[in-house]
Amino acid sequence: MRQAATERLGIGYKNLRKAAPNIIYASATGYRRNSPKDGRPAYDDVIQGESGLVDLIDKTNGEARFVPMPISDKFCGHTLASAIGMALFSREKTGKGQEIHVPMLETMLAFNLTTHLWEGTKGPTNDLGYPRALSPYRIPYKTKDGMVCVLAHTDEQWHRLLRAIGRSDLIEDARFTKLSERAQNIATLQSYLAEELAKFTTEEAFRKLDEADLPNGPVAKLDELMIDPYLQETNFFQKIDDPHENIVFTTAPPVDFSGTPATVRSAAPALGQHSEEILLSAGISKNIVNKIINKGR
């Protein structure tokens, strides 16, 4: 919600801080406060475009497209949650609350340019974009009957990978001996991998890569994930009761806590389901809450 709206509704930081001086007040909008774009509306697709993410996809496949998920919304939400955790820790130490604001554009710029600032670390330049990540060969490798994903980073891993695919001769090739040389010739190196892996079946490729202790895996189809044996073994998909849908499937929390295990406690709430609970927890009297609810009916 944009700042003008929260102020108009009387739920801005300054107002709420009067009632709860140590409040941690978190918000996210499209752009940084007090900037030329402050107050402009923004959604995920807009931020994908402005942050250079669409251009990155264009650079890899020659077509400007959005990432097929609301990645800006998701990452900004994670950033906001992380910031809230840090503010809570600070309050435990100092007793003081604070206001947190996460601008979507700046958050996604930081997310993208951590990888792709590249030569821009030396100053303004047209040479942005990490070559290895933008290589046309940075794709799953085709086998005789499918595809595999494999990645090597260290010199030793590259040596093991080249031996595994039968190209030990490339280990001493001056273009690939060190990280800096590989970075400059990554497309050529990846083209060799593609050529050799295409000679194996998928199972043969997995076996060779596993024997070399290299990170590798399949290309999973989205509609096969819910019956994937590994995910079934780890109970990743969970059934929960939903008063509106009877039973719904959802994903389990991906983080494991040894002392405070995470659980899915309930389905997503219906519209207004928790309004009374939230208002009461904010310190608003039961009488006023009832008036608010009755007025809204």
What are these language model-derived features?
Residues 172-182, 219-227, 288-297:
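Short linear loop/turn motifs
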Residues 177, 245-291:
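Flexible, small-/acidic-enriched active-site or ligand-binding loops
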Residues 5-148, 152-153:
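Active-site-adjacent "lid/gating" segments in soluble enzymes
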Residues 4, 30-32, 223-224, 293:
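Conserved beta-strand edge residues that scaffold enzyme active sites
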Residues 11, 167-170, 231, 284-285:
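Helix N-cap/coil-helix junction residues
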Residues 211-265:
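A glycine-rich dinucleotide-binding beta-alpha-beta segment and adjacent secondary-structure elements
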Residues 136-212, 216:
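Aromatic-enriched alpha-helical interface/lid elements that frame and gate functional surfaces
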